[in-house]
Amino acid sequence: MKILFLDQSGKPGGAELCLIDIAKPYRDRALVGLFTDGSFKNLLQQNNIPVEVLANKTIQVRKESSLAQGLKSLGQLAPLITKVVKTASEYDLIYANTQKALVVGALASLFSRRPLVYHLHDILSKEHFSQTNLRIAINLANRFASLVIANSQASKTAFVQAGGNPNIIKVVYNGFEPKIYQTSKSDIKQLKQNLGLERQFVVGHFSRLAPWKGQHILIAALAECPPQVTALFVGDALFGEQDYVQQLHQQIAEMGLENRVKFLGFRSDIPQLMAACELVAHTSTSPEPFGRVIVEAMLCGRPVVAAKAGGAIELVEHRINGFLVTPGKPQELAQVITTCLQEIETTATIAHNAQAIASQRFDVTTINQQIAQLLSKYGSDKPTG
């Protein structure tokens, strides 16, 4: 089966990392069409996945865009849609991996008469999307998609509650390669030395710096933890979110935590950095559709504490394979951090359980088999290694 994958992003986020794993088995007869140039294209090329930037300029539509802004963007979309329709005629299936890709993919599906699959990586709610964009996404999916793949039960539930057709949606979790998350003790020791964290109890936070990701929650919790607890933030702010970064530094200064917080910015050595942490914290204040960071921490053999909402509830069972806390409650988070610091053996057992469960439940080979089975209706060919 020949698949045309579509994605709007030039930068690799969770949806894009997921797409790499899905596209790999089909790479000898697939193309990933991007709407923006950037580092994601380089990452696809490193994985030997054919890629082409299809748009000449960035499409200016945000999740919270109004109807007028959305209609204005249609003029920008016309050349892109024309190109995608022409390209799609050479493929058996259009696979839209993001919401803007759904808009383009739906129209391309109509004109090229190719089936459309939409991979839903978002919780479609008014909390994250304008009413206009919500309506567009649901109507296009209902009208044009043969299949919607949701990355969690939480994403599926929100889709159906927003008016999505429950008969076309299936849940498939993200897949991971467990071996990527294995780091030697000597490498961990060296990394902690390089970071100046040898004697610290390190709580890692891995995500872009944004208010809803809740870095400020961890900083507030840190103030209530023993002095050997240090927070390590890995990730950058996107354009327009620099004010939040300034707020974080102001919060740190006001609480006198300058010597207990490190910002590393964007890093590519995530598994190694996670392995160098004693605990990984997920502190999103809004429901997370899936939570790749949670699974990655588990695969690294590190205990994880997650905000009890959205997809995280499907990944973490409290005190079985991790810890759950109420979103936006620093006091609860501080209690869990202190517990992990004091109850070392119990915490190690929980982390070991999590690693064993995650290695089986989210193995990329198993997940890709689930995807292939769903896509098999659109062609008799199976993916090659």
Show the residue positions of the predicted features.
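N-terminal strand-loop element at the rim of the active site
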Residues: 5-13, 21-74, 155-158, 170-171, ...
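A conserved mid-protein helix/loop that constitutes part of the nucleotide-sugar donor-binding site
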Residues: 13-21, 201, 208-224, 243, ...
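Short His-centered aromatic/hydrophobic patch
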Residues: 96-102, 120
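Acidic anion/phosphate-binding donor-loop and adjacent secondary structure
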Residues: 129, 157-161, 166-168, 175-194, ...
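Active-site donor-binding acidic/aromatic loop of nucleotide-activated sugar
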Residues: 240-245, 258-267, 273, 323-324
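Short hydrophobic beta-strand element within catalytic cores of glycosyltransferases
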Residues: 303-306, 316
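Conserved acidic donor-binding segment of nucleotide-sugar-dependent glycosyltransferases
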Residues: 317-319, 323-330, 339-345
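A short, well-ordered alpha-helix in the C-terminal region of glycosyltransferases
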Residues: 332, 339, 346-360, 367-373
